[in-house]
């Protein structure tokens, strides 16, 4: 009886730990997605790997799946508030997808080097940038750019982002936000809205290919991560769309910095 009791206690403990880990992973990822258009992969994968001892490939697959719904609900929320550039978003999305494939193919030919901490450090510094040098572009300043020029810029930036994503394997959320705000001169809300719109599709492609190659995920963890990330992304997106630009820059900056630090600390545990 004792052995059985111990086993059931262990199982209960495991369930408890799984729920706690997925809750915080989903919270970090959802806030990052809803506020900053950041990929859930940056937060969820390291947590699943560190605390649930999950296979890294599977962890990334689960993280990308969490991204899909979280990005979709965020894109919907930003779109309803007119903070989404669908036309250029589509142009960018197609070029991102195509060049992600090309990038990952080239990466597979070269000796494998990991760029694990690259995206984390970038997340942190992007956070610092939003606090020190907020994005104060407006819808008006955005409409000054001729449509044709904007379309060509979107294509070029999509190629760059896709190539980096495929090559580094890093989620393009950060890259996209950085490029939309600093290179393309997007207003912050529109940048995040367009970023999550694109990410819905890039994450879907990534998730499907992960499971096609790596097999089915651990279902309870999968469901918990997807649900928690979705809820927090929805909350964050609603807040973000109501916020003043100054506030949003600060909140985005703080969240990115915190996530950068947290994920960086995790990478030491492993």
Question: What spans do the regions from the language model cover?
Answer:
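Membrane-interface alpha-helices at helix entry/exit sites of multi-pass transporters
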Residues: 54-62, 87-88, 185-196
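Juxtamembrane transmembrane-helix boundary motif
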Residues: 5-31, 45, 49-51, 56, ...
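Extracellular interaction modules
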Residues: 1-2
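Transmembrane helix-bundle signature of multi-pass membrane transporters/permeases
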Residues: 30, 60-68, 192-203, 256
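Hydrophobic, membrane-facing alpha-helical anchors
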Residues: 13-18, 22, 65-76, 170-180
